[in-house]
Protein backbone atom coordinates (compact mmCIF):
# COMPACT_ATOMS: atom_id res chain seq x y z
CA UNK A 1 0.00 0.00 0.00
CA UNK A 2 1.57 3.26 -1.17
CA UNK A 3 1.15 6.85 -0.06
CA UNK A 4 1.95 9.99 -2.00
CA UNK A 5 3.31 13.43 -1.10
CA UNK A 6 5.00 12.43 2.17
CA UNK A 7 6.33 15.12 4.53
CA UNK A 8 8.41 14.81 7.71
CA UNK A 9 7.51 16.62 10.93
CA UNK A 10 7.84 16.67 14.72
CA UNK A 11 4.90 15.83 16.95
CA UNK A 12 3.94 18.53 19.47
CA UNK A 13 0.62 17.54 21.07
CA UNK A 14 -2.81 16.06 20.43
CA UNK A 15 -5.74 18.22 21.60
CA UNK A 16 -8.30 15.50 20.81
CA UNK A 17 -8.69 12.14 19.06
CA UNK A 18 -8.93 13.63 15.61
CA UNK A 19 -6.21 16.27 15.33
CA UNK A 20 -2.62 16.91 16.39
CA UNK A 21 -0.18 19.79 16.27
CA UNK A 22 2.96 19.03 14.28
CA UNK A 23 5.95 21.19 13.41
CA UNK A 24 6.58 21.03 9.65
CA UNK A 25 9.42 23.05 8.14
CA UNK A 26 9.47 25.36 11.14
CA UNK A 27 5.71 26.00 11.10
CA UNK A 28 3.13 24.55 13.50
CA UNK A 29 0.37 22.80 11.55
CA UNK A 30 -2.91 21.30 12.71
CA UNK A 31 -3.11 17.83 11.12
CA UNK A 32 -5.61 15.00 10.96
CA UNK A 33 -4.72 11.86 12.96
CA UNK A 34 -5.73 8.73 11.03
CA UNK A 35 -6.25 6.74 14.21
CA UNK A 36 -8.78 7.59 16.93
CA UNK A 37 -7.14 5.17 19.40
CA UNK A 38 -5.14 6.43 22.36
CA UNK A 39 -1.68 5.82 20.83
CA UNK A 40 -0.04 7.43 23.87
CA UNK A 41 3.07 5.29 23.54
CA UNK A 42 3.50 6.53 19.95
CA UNK A 43 2.59 10.21 20.07
CA UNK A 44 5.31 11.51 22.37
CA UNK A 45 6.29 15.19 22.09
CA UNK A 46 9.35 15.61 19.88
CA UNK A 47 8.86 12.31 18.04
CA UNK A 48 9.62 12.26 14.33
CA UNK A 49 6.42 11.69 12.34
CA UNK A 50 5.51 11.34 8.69
CA UNK A 51 2.47 12.85 7.07
CA UNK A 52 0.65 12.62 3.75
CA UNK A 53 -0.39 15.92 2.20
CA UNK A 54 -4.01 15.94 1.06
CA UNK A 55 -4.87 16.65 -2.56
CA UNK A 56 -8.17 18.22 -1.46
CA UNK A 57 -7.72 22.01 -1.14
CA UNK A 58 -11.10 22.34 0.61
CA UNK A 59 -10.07 20.28 3.63
CA UNK A 60 -9.66 22.00 7.00
CA UNK A 61 -6.41 20.10 7.59
CA UNK A 62 -3.81 19.80 4.85
CA UNK A 63 -2.02 16.74 6.26
CA UNK A 64 -2.77 13.23 7.59
CA UNK A 65 -0.46 11.85 10.28
CA UNK A 66 0.27 8.27 9.22
CA UNK A 67 3.60 7.09 10.65
CA UNK A 68 5.83 7.63 13.69
CA UNK A 69 9.47 6.83 14.39
CA UNK A 70 9.26 5.31 17.88
CA UNK A 71 12.41 5.45 20.00
CA UNK A 72 14.21 2.08 20.13
CA UNK A 73 11.61 0.55 17.80
CA UNK A 74 11.70 2.34 14.46
CA UNK A 75 8.87 3.14 12.09
CA UNK A 76 5.32 2.25 13.09
CA UNK A 77 2.42 2.95 10.77
CA UNK A 78 -0.56 4.20 12.80
CA UNK A 79 -3.06 4.70 9.97
CA UNK A 80 -6.14 2.71 11.03
CA UNK A 81 -7.42 2.52 7.45
CA UNK A 82 -4.36 0.94 5.84
CA UNK A 83 -4.55 -2.59 7.37
CA UNK A 84 -7.72 -3.42 5.41
CA UNK A 85 -6.25 -2.03 2.19
CA UNK A 86 -2.97 -3.87 2.70
CA UNK A 87 -4.82 -7.10 3.53
CA UNK A 88 -6.91 -6.82 0.37
CA UNK A 89 -3.77 -6.42 -1.76
CA UNK A 90 -2.02 -9.25 0.10
CA UNK A 91 -4.84 -11.78 -0.24
CA UNK A 92 -5.41 -10.88 -3.90
CA UNK A 93 -1.70 -11.42 -4.56
CA UNK A 94 -2.05 -15.05 -3.42
CA UNK A 95 -0.17 -14.90 -0.11
CA UNK A 96 -2.86 -16.55 2.03
CA UNK A 97 -4.51 -19.15 -0.21
CA UNK A 98 -2.77 -21.36 -2.80
CA UNK A 99 -5.56 -21.27 -5.36
CA UNK A 100 -6.92 -18.31 -7.29
CA UNK A 101 -9.62 -16.59 -5.25
CA UNK A 102 -12.17 -13.84 -5.65
CA UNK A 103 -11.96 -11.26 -2.87
CA UNK A 104 -14.83 -8.95 -1.91
CA UNK A 105 -14.28 -6.19 0.68
CA UNK A 106 -16.94 -5.17 3.22
CA UNK A 107 -19.14 -8.23 2.71
CA UNK A 108 -22.45 -8.42 4.58
CA UNK A 109 -23.55 -11.76 5.99
CA UNK A 110 -26.74 -11.83 8.03
CA UNK A 111 -26.49 -8.99 10.51
CA UNK A 112 -22.72 -8.89 10.20
CA UNK A 113 -20.28 -7.16 7.89
CA UNK A 114 -16.78 -8.57 7.48
CA UNK A 115 -13.71 -6.87 6.09
CA UNK A 116 -13.08 -9.48 3.39
CA UNK A 117 -15.00 -12.34 1.81
CA UNK A 118 -12.98 -14.89 -0.15
CA UNK A 119 -14.42 -17.53 -2.44
CA UNK A 120 -13.09 -20.12 -4.86
CA UNK A 121 -14.01 -23.61 -5.98
CA UNK A 122 -12.39 -24.89 -2.78
CA UNK A 123 -13.55 -22.47 -0.10
CA UNK A 124 -15.83 -19.75 1.18
CA UNK A 125 -14.20 -17.69 3.91
CA UNK A 126 -14.73 -14.53 5.91
CA UNK A 127 -11.74 -12.51 7.12
CA UNK A 128 -11.82 -9.86 9.84
CA UNK A 129 -8.77 -7.57 9.89
CA UNK A 130 -7.36 -5.81 12.96
CA UNK A 131 -4.50 -3.33 12.85
CA UNK A 132 -2.03 -3.58 15.74
CA UNK A 133 0.11 -0.59 16.77
CA UNK A 134 0.69 -1.34 20.47
CA UNK A 135 4.09 -2.85 21.34
CA UNK A 136 6.16 -3.26 24.48
CA UNK A 137 9.11 -5.57 25.22
CA UNK A 138 8.98 -6.79 21.59
CA UNK A 139 5.44 -8.09 22.10
CA UNK A 140 2.59 -6.78 19.96
CA UNK A 141 -0.75 -6.52 21.74
CA UNK A 142 -4.37 -5.78 20.88
CA UNK A 143 -6.48 -3.93 21.81
CA UNK A 144 -5.01 -0.72 23.22
CA UNK A 145 -8.44 0.14 24.71
CA UNK A 146 -11.53 -1.95 25.55
CA UNK A 147 -13.30 -2.99 22.34
CA UNK A 148 -16.80 -4.41 22.55
CA UNK A 149 -16.85 -4.19 18.76
CA UNK A 150 -13.84 -6.49 18.61
CA UNK A 151 -15.54 -9.03 20.87
CA UNK A 152 -18.64 -8.88 18.66
CA UNK A 153 -16.55 -9.55 15.55
CA UNK A 154 -14.99 -12.64 17.14
CA UNK A 155 -18.38 -14.05 18.09
CA UNK A 156 -19.60 -13.43 14.54
CA UNK A 157 -16.60 -15.34 13.16
CA UNK A 158 -17.48 -18.28 15.44
CA UNK A 159 -21.03 -18.17 14.06
CA UNK A 160 -19.68 -18.28 10.49
CA UNK A 161 -17.70 -21.41 11.37
CA UNK A 162 -20.88 -23.00 12.70
CA UNK A 163 -22.61 -22.17 9.40
CA UNK A 164 -19.94 -23.99 7.38
CA UNK A 165 -17.68 -21.12 6.34
CA UNK A 166 -13.97 -20.75 7.00
CA UNK A 167 -13.23 -17.85 9.33
CA UNK A 168 -10.04 -15.88 9.85
CA UNK A 169 -8.86 -13.14 12.17
CA UNK A 170 -5.93 -11.40 10.48
CA UNK A 171 -3.86 -9.30 12.88
CA UNK A 172 -1.83 -6.82 10.85
CA UNK A 173 1.07 -5.68 13.05
CA UNK A 174 2.00 -2.29 11.65
CA UNK A 175 5.75 -2.59 12.34
CA UNK A 176 8.70 -5.00 12.10
CA UNK A 177 10.74 -6.77 14.75
CA UNK A 178 8.22 -8.11 17.27
CA UNK A 179 8.72 -11.56 18.79
CA UNK A 180 5.06 -12.53 19.14
CA UNK A 181 1.47 -11.35 19.44
CA UNK A 182 -0.60 -11.56 22.62
CA UNK A 183 -4.06 -10.29 23.56
CA UNK A 184 -3.89 -7.25 25.82
CA UNK A 185 -5.26 -9.06 28.86
CA UNK A 186 -4.87 -6.19 31.28
CA UNK A 187 -6.78 -3.75 29.08
CA UNK A 188 -9.63 -6.02 27.93
CA UNK A 189 -9.72 -9.52 29.35
CA UNK A 190 -13.01 -10.39 27.63
CA UNK A 191 -11.41 -9.90 24.22
CA UNK A 192 -8.63 -12.34 25.11
CA UNK A 193 -11.07 -14.92 26.44
CA UNK A 194 -13.26 -14.62 23.34
CA UNK A 195 -10.15 -14.97 21.18
CA UNK A 196 -9.38 -18.24 22.97
CA UNK A 197 -12.97 -19.40 22.35
CA UNK A 198 -12.68 -18.51 18.66
CA UNK A 199 -9.47 -20.51 18.35
CA UNK A 200 -11.09 -23.55 19.95
CA UNK A 201 -14.06 -23.19 17.59
CA UNK A 202 -11.76 -23.39 14.57
CA UNK A 203 -11.30 -19.74 13.68
CA UNK A 204 -7.84 -19.22 12.17
CA UNK A 205 -5.92 -16.63 14.23
CA UNK A 206 -3.12 -15.20 12.09
CA UNK A 207 -0.62 -12.44 12.85
CA UNK A 208 1.77 -10.86 10.34
CA UNK A 209 4.25 -8.04 10.69
CA UNK A 210 4.73 -5.35 8.06
CA UNK A 211 7.46 -3.66 6.14
CA UNK A 212 6.97 -0.01 7.05
CA UNK A 213 8.51 2.94 5.24
CA UNK A 214 7.39 6.58 5.32
CA UNK A 215 5.51 6.17 2.03
CA UNK A 216 4.28 2.56 2.19
CA UNK A 217 3.27 -0.45 4.28
CA UNK A 218 3.22 -4.07 3.12
CA UNK A 219 2.24 -7.23 4.99
CA UNK A 220 5.33 -9.40 5.25
CA UNK A 221 6.16 -12.20 7.72
CA UNK A 222 4.12 -14.41 10.08
CA UNK A 223 4.39 -13.72 13.82
CA UNK A 224 3.73 -16.34 16.54
CA UNK A 225 0.41 -15.95 18.36
CA UNK A 226 0.33 -16.67 22.09
CA UNK A 227 -3.16 -16.89 23.59
CA UNK A 228 -2.19 -18.17 27.05
CA UNK A 229 -3.01 -15.78 29.90
CA UNK A 230 -0.61 -15.29 32.79
CA UNK A 231 -2.33 -12.09 33.89
CA UNK A 232 -4.72 -12.29 36.81
Regions flagged by a language model, labelled:
Residues 40, 73-103:
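Acidic-basic catalytic patches of nuclease active cores, encompassing PD-(D/E)XK
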Residues 57-73:
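OB-fold/S1-family single-stranded nucleic acid-binding modules
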Residues 9, 114-144, 157:
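Conserved catalytic cores of phosphodiester-cleaving nucleases, focusing on short active-site segments
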Residues 27-41:
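Beta-strand/loop nucleic-acid-binding surfaces
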Residues 45-56, 209:
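Flexible glycine-rich surface loops and low-complexity tracts that mediate binding to linear polymers
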Residues 138-148, 158-187, 209:
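Nucleic-acid nuclease catalytic cores
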Residues 16-21:
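Short aromatic-glycine-enriched beta-strand elements
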Residues 174-232:
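Domain-level recognition of nuclease-like catalytic cores that cleave nucleotide substrates
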